[in-house]
Amino acid sequence: MAMEIGEDEWKVCCGSSEFAKQMSTSGPLTSQEAIYTARDIWFNQVNVTDWLEAFSAHPQIGNTPSPSINSDFARRSVSEQSTAFATTSASALQELAEWNVLYKKKFGFIFIICASGRTHAEMLHALKERYENRPIVELEIAAMEQMKITELRMAKLFSDKAKVISETDSSSSPVSTKPQDRLRIIGGHLNVAAEAKAPKRSRPPITTHVLDVSRGAPAAGVEVHLEVWSGTTGPSFVHGGGGVWSSVGTSATDRDGRSGPLMDLVDALNPGTYRISFDTAKYSPGCFFPYVSIVFQVTESQKWEHFHVPLLLAPFSFSTYRGS
C-alpha cells in the first residue's frame, strides 16, 4: 500500500534534513518503492554535509542519547543498542568510550554502525578494525551503515502505519461476508504485493564507481566491462566451467569516478553470474594489478534489487563491497 509520509517522520529514520525533505516530496510510496527511493537519494542526491548531519544525530555507540535529541529518534537509538548494553560491563564501556574519542579525532565524525542485534564486543571489534581505514574510505562505509539503520527504521515505520490503517479499517468498515467480496479483497492484496515487487528503476540495475584511495579522490577514465556467464553450469573456480562470458556493456568512469551505463535500464535483472572488470593498468601503469575482475551472483529473489559494485583502488591493494 502506498503511503504519504511526512518530513518529520522521515527524519526519525535518518537525521539528514535534506534526505527527509526529498523523501517527503517523493510520495506516496509503497515500502519497497521507499527503499529504492531512499537509496537513490542517500547515495546520489544528498551531499557529504547531509551525511555528516545524519551521523551527528546519533549518540555515540555505548552512550545513551542526549535529552535534546528528537525523542522518537532517541528511543530508536536506545532500542537498537539494547543487545550491546545487555552484553557489556562498566570497564568495557570505558574502553569503547576511549576508542570513540580516538575515532572521532581521526575522522571528524562519530563511529556509525548498524547496532541492531550486535553485542558490545562485536561493535568494539568493528571500531578498532575500521579505525585503520583512510578517511575517505571510512566515510563511505559510515554512509552505508547509516543506510542500513535507515532501512530498518523505515520498515518499522511502514509496519506501524499499516497496523494503524488496518485497525482503523476494521473498526469502521462492516465485515464482508460475500464470497465475491472476499475474493476482491484477496485480489487487491495480491495486486499491491505485485506492484511493490516491481518498482520502476531510475538507473540500470548494475552500477559501479572507482575510488583512488592513494589520492583520496575519484578515479576518472577507468574502462569498465560488464559480462554475464552463459552456460549450462556455473563458472568453476579453477577451470572456468562449461560456458563462456558474454559481454553486457562497456563504459568508462567520469570525473566523479562513476561509470556510464553498463546495461539497459530494465526493471527485472536476469538472475545469473556477472563479472565486472576494470582496466587498472591503463589508469595507473605502475599498479600491481593489470586489471581487476569481480564476480558476483544475482538470484531469482534479488532480480528487483540494485547492485552497486565499486572498486577502491590503491597501487598495491584493492577492495570492494556490495553497495546500493
Swiss-Prot record:
PTM summary: Phosphorylated by BRI1 in vitro.
Distribution of this protein across tissues and organs: Expressed ubiquitously with highest levels in flowers buds and elongating inflorescences.
GO annotation, cellular component aspect: cytoplasmic side of plasma membrane; cytosol; extrinsic component of cytoplasmic side of plasma membrane; peroxisome
Residue span of region OHCU decarboxylase: 2-161
Disruption phenotype: Longer hypocotyls and roots, as well as greater fresh weight due to plant growth promotion. Enhanced sensitivity to brassinosteroid (BR) in term of plant growth regulation. Increased freezing tolerance to cold treatment. The double mutant b1l ttl exhibits a developmental phenotype and freezing tolerance comparable to the single mutant ttl.
Induction or repression: Not regulated by plant steroids.
Region (Required for BRI1-binding): 2-29
Molecular function GO labels: 2-oxo-4-hydroxy-4-carboxy-5-ureidoimidazoline decarboxylase activity; hydroxyisourate hydrolase activity; identical protein binding
Membrane topology: Peripheral membrane protein
InterPro entries attached to this UniProt entry: HIU_hydrol/OHCU_decarb, Hydroxyisourate_hydrolase, OHCU_decarboxylase, OHCU_decarboxylase_sf, Thyroxine_BS, Transthyretin/HIU_hydrolase, Transthyretin/HIU_hydrolase_d, Transthyretin/HIU_hydrolase_sf
Motif window: Internal peroxisomal targeting signal (PTS2): 182-190
Catalytic activity: 5-hydroxyisourate + H2O = 5-hydroxy-2-oxo-4-ureido-2,5-dihydro-1H-imidazole-5-carboxylate + H(+); 5-hydroxy-2-oxo-4-ureido-2,5-dihydro-1H-imidazole-5-carboxylate + H(+) = (S)-allantoin + CO2
Residues that bear N-acetylalanine: 2
GO biological process: allantoin biosynthetic process; brassinosteroid mediated signaling pathway; cold acclimation; protein tetramerization; purine nucleobase metabolic process; regulation of brassinosteroid mediated signaling pathway; regulation of cell growth by extracellular stimulus; regulation of seedling development
Residue positions of the active site: 58
Keywords: Acetylation, Cell membrane, Cytoplasm, Decarboxylase, Hydrolase, Lyase, Membrane, Multifunctional enzyme, Peroxisome, Phosphoprotein, Purine metabolism
Domain notes: The N-terminal 29 amino acids are essential, but not sufficient, for the interaction with BRI1.
Role of this protein: Involved in the last two steps of the degradation of uric acid, i.e. the hydrolysis of 5-hydroxyisourate (HIU) to 2-oxo-4-hydroxy-4-carboxy-5-ureidoimidazoline (OHCU) and its stereoselective decarboxylation to (S)-allantoin, a major ureide compound. Might function as a negative regulator to modulate brassinosteroid-mediated plant growth. Together with B1L, prevents plant growth and development, but by opposition to B1L, negatively regulates cold tolerance, probably in a brassinosteroid (BR) and allantoin-dependent manner.
Entries under NCBIfam families matching the protein: hdxy_isourate (TIGR02962)
Family membership: In the N-terminal section; belongs to the OHCU decarboxylase family. In the C-terminal section; belongs to the transthyretin family. 5-hydroxyisourate hydrolase subfamily.
UniProt protein name: Uric acid degradation bifunctional protein TTL
Gene field: TTL
